[in-house]
């Protein structure tokens, strides 16, 4: 199953990292905060302005992005947790 975001929404897959303390203890997922980085896997057509014109999104599929801890809505598609959020919830694109 695929999901196609509407308007100025994007679908983001969180980038997971193994969480360890400095002494090497692995922190379980239930105790760790969710990462605030992800990769965009789908984008909507753009934001509709007051004049009725559609402004394309600045982000594109494959971009690595930073977002706030409470950004977006979590959905589960084909057993995978994804985030649906508006482009304005994205704080920046990681380049390089």
Curated annotation (Swiss-Prot):
Presence of the UniProt keyword DNA repair in the record: no
Disulfide bridge partners, by residue number: none
Keyword terms: Chaperone, Cytoplasm
Chief location: cytoplasm
One BP annotation, GO: chaperone cofactor-dependent protein refolding
Alphabetized InterPro entries for the sequence: Chaperonin_GroES, Chaperonin_GroES_sf, Chaprnonin_Cpn10_CS, GroES-like_sf
Database matches in CDD domains: cpn10
CC terms in the record's Gene Ontology section: cytoplasm
Subcellular location(s) per record: Cytoplasm
Pfam families per record: Cpn10 (PF00166)
Keyword match Cytoplasm: yes
A single MF term (Gene Ontology): unfolded protein binding
Role this protein plays: Together with the chaperonin GroEL, plays an essential role in assisting protein folding. The GroEL-GroES system forms a nano-cage that allows encapsulation of the non-native substrate proteins and provides a physical environment optimized to promote and accelerate protein folding. GroES binds to the apical surface of the GroEL ring, thereby capping the opening of the GroEL channel.
Family: Belongs to the GroES chaperonin family.
Record's subunit section: Heptamer of 7 subunits arranged in a ring. Interacts with the chaperonin GroEL.
Protein name: Co-chaperonin GroES
Taxonomic source organism: Nitrosospira multiformis (strain ATCC 25196 / NCIMB 11849 / C 71)
Annotated gene: groES
């Amino acid at each position: 199953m695929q999901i196609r975001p509407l308007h100025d929404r994007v679908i983001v897959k969180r980038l997971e990292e193994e969480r360890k303390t400095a002494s090497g203890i692995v922190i379980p997922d239930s105790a760790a905060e969710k990462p605030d980085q992800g990769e965009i896997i789908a984008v909507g057509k753009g934001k509709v302005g007051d004049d009725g014109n559609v402004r394309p999104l600045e982000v594109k599929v494959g971009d690595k992005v930073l977002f706030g801890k409470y950004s977006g809505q979590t959905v589960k598609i084909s057993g995978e947790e994804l985030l649906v959020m508006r482009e304005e919830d994205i704080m920046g694109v990681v380049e390089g």
